[in-house]
UniProtKB/Swiss-Prot annotation:
EC number(s) on file: 6.3.4.2
Pathway participation: Pyrimidine metabolism; CTP biosynthesis via de novo pathway; CTP from UDP: step 2/2
GO biological process: 'de novo' CTP biosynthetic process; CTP biosynthetic process; pyrimidine nucleobase biosynthetic process
Family membership: Belongs to the CTP synthase family.
Listed name of the protein: CTP synthase 2
Role description: Catalyzes the ATP-dependent amination of UTP to CTP with either L-glutamine or ammonia as the source of nitrogen. Constitutes the rate-limiting enzyme in the synthesis of cytosine nucleotides.
GO cellular component, one term: cytoplasm
Record: active site: C399 (for gatase activity), H526 (for gatase activity), E528 (for gatase activity)
Cystine crosslinks: none
Length: 578
């Protein structure tokens, strides 16, 4: 087993997750089996109770783990399925050690950060690195470990010490450290500054770890003189300094790393028997990145949500839309609309904001309402759903988005004017959405219906079933506490809102479709978590096809994308790579 530790310096959010994912992608393209571990040095047990504004979206895994969004990057880039134990937090480590102490496992010894916490970290990494994450269920050969935060953070010190010890246990030929640092370029001088990187590397060395590769992040390509300066002052060879400047898309990052000889370096440094040139998989990434940069035709989508001030809150939704747009040769123009701005109360409070929100909604070729929690902005989401339904604009509702589509239909079609979800109005006389029987109030963490669940199609006359290649059932990831009221299902279906997908027992409604509408779909699950760059999520793909006016042709052609029936349609806008 080979271990690659990715650390960060200067500032957080410098792009360690994308760098780690890209390194994994390159090594996987060389025929190696790769897994990934993300370490978050916070005391929370998991990410499930975080505000999206604190840490971005909560990514859900097949086993129901609620984890950091970087694990979503790993899954998308590497096309693997990780587990909740691939996300290590300080809270998990301390909980494990304290439980052992309570059981008497330490035989009365004084339990300390060194050696007990550091040993627990190393043990966790060793065990989890062996867990298969590919479809063939074979043990991984490479484990990429990302340490969250920056060098010098007090929260990360136990982990740094653990890996200082770990490098000797693993042996030099099995362990290397990649340090990601920022090279700022102040506008006042226009000069790229190396001092922050020098200080960061010095701090890392002072803690017992020496970087094997220094990945320098910058806004613009770094000059050769800067590379030589970093090489000299950070005591590494020039080829050990890698540049990653801002690029048009994250798909370009693995190509950027590969072009700077990173495969040859890993082959020598970790004694890996691989070819210097990657397999066709990385060439597919290059073609995808090239095609992304050539796209001219745009499809405008309105994302009507609650957490629109920070795009990280909807990372997986954005990526799923981007994957689908790329598959049909369109550039995605995603407009984030705060749902509260669409509400009538906003018209009196801030008319400019209200009219701007509605102007953007009116320009959208498709409307998406994602998952969420809480009352704020729900009426604005319902307004957007009404707009999409009445004007036959393609609509996709995810989790809460589907539930609110049901509420909107109950109010405006079934004439239950006070219909609502019991989440927002526990005393409503017409509960269109109710809390699930197995949900018990109390602890917030881990109390939802989480993880991969089976959804069975109840009819062959379903556009979503066709998008899923006419499978009898699908398995997608869930994260919710509420469900559609099964007592109202018959009334909904009589008026044209069909529940085409249900759980195994036929009691829980999972997929809705509206008759007579180009694409009005709601899903209780989160298909964005399983979308991949080269395998877009079917509900998102159908949504983008409908928004671009290509859905009917796609369905008539047996739901197959080919150069003849998709890319060549816009040969004047984008070259075909096939």
């Amino acid at each position: 087993m080979k271990y690659i530790l990715v650390t960060g310096g200067v500032i957080s959010g410098v792009g360690k997750g994308i760098i780690a994912s890209s390194i994994g992608t390159i090594l996987k393209s060389c025929g190696l089996r790769v897994t990934a571990i993300k370490i978050d040095p916070y005391i929370n047990i998991d990410a499930g109770t975080f505000s999206p504004y604190e840490h971005g979206e909560v990514f859900v895994l097949n086993d129901g783990g609620e984890v950091d969004l970087d694990l979503g990057n790993y899954e998308r880039f590497l096309d693997i399925n990780l587990y909740k134990d691939n996300n290590i937090t300080t809270g998990k480590i301390y909980q494990q050690v304290i439980n052992r102490e309570r059981r008497g496992d330490y035989l009365g010894k004084t339990v300390q950060v060194v050696p007990h916490i550091t040993d627990a970290i190393q043990e966790w990494v060793l065990n989890q690195a062996k867990v298969p994450v590919d479809r063939d269920q074979k043990e991984p050969q490479i484990c990429v470990i990302e340490l969250g935060g920056t060098i010098g953070d007090i929260e990360g010190m136990p982990f740094i010490e653990a890996f200082r010890q770990f490098q000797f246990k693993a042996k030099r030929e099995n362990f290397c450290n990649i340090h990601v640092s920022l090279v700022p370029q102040p506008s006042a001088t226009g000069e790229q500054k190396t001092k922050p990187t020098q200080n960061s590397v010095r701090a890392l060395r002072g803690l017992g770890l020496s970087p094997d590769l220094i990945v320098c992040r910058s806004a613009k390509p770094i000059e050769m003189a800067v590379k030589q300066k970093i090489s000299m002052f950070c005591h590494v060879e020039p080829e050990q300094v890698i540049f990653v400047h801002d690029v048009s898309s994250t798909y370009r990052v693995p190509i950027l790393l590969q072009e700077q000889g990173i495969i040859k370096y890993f082959k020598q440094r970790l004694s890996i028997p691989i070819e210097d040139q990657p397999s066709t998989q990385l060439f597919k990434w290059k073609r995808m990145a090239d095609r992304y940069e050539r796209l001219l035709k745009t499809c405008s989508i309105a994302l009507v949500g609650k957490y629109t001030k920070l795009s990280d809150c909807y990372t997986s939704v954005f990526k799923a839309l981007e994957h689908s747009a790329l598959a049909i040769n369109h550039k995605l123009n995603l407009m984030y609309i705060d749902s509260a701005d669409l509400e009538p109360s906003m018209k009196a409070q801030d008319p400019v904001k209200y009219h701007k929100a509605w102007e953007e909604l009116c320009k959208a070729e498709g409307i998406l309402v994602p998952g969420g929690f809480g009352l704020r902005g729900t009426e604005g989401k319902i307004q957007a759903i009404t707009w999409a339904r009445e004007r036959k604009i393609p609509f996709l509702g995810i989790c809460l988005g589907m539930q609110l589509a049901v509420v909107e239909f109950a109010r405006n079609i079934l004439k239950m004017t006070d219909a609502n979800s019991t989440e927002f109005d526990p005393n409503t006389k017409n509960p269109a959405v109710i809390d699930m029987p197995e949900h018990h109030p109390g602890d917030m963490g881990g109390t939802m219906r989480l993880g991969s669940r089976k959804t069975v199609f109840k009819t062959s006359e379903s556009v979503v079933k066709k998008l899923y290649d006419n499978q009898d059932f699908v398995e997608e990831r869930h994260r919710h506490r509420y469900e559609v009221n099964p007592e109202l299902v018959q009334q909904f279906e009589e008026k044209g809102l069909k529940f085409v997908g249900q759980d195994n027992e036929g009691q829980r409604m999972e997929i809705i479709e509206l008759e007579g509408h180009p694409y009005f779909v709601g899903v209780q699950f989160h298909p964005e978590f399983c979308s991949r760059p080269m395998k877009p999520s079917p509900p998102y793909l159908g949504f983008m096809l409908a928004a671009s006016g290509k859905l009917n042709t796609y369905v008539q052609n047996g739901c197959k994308l080919s150069p003849r029936n998709s890319y060549s349609e816009h040969s004047d806008e984008s070259s075909s790579d096939s």
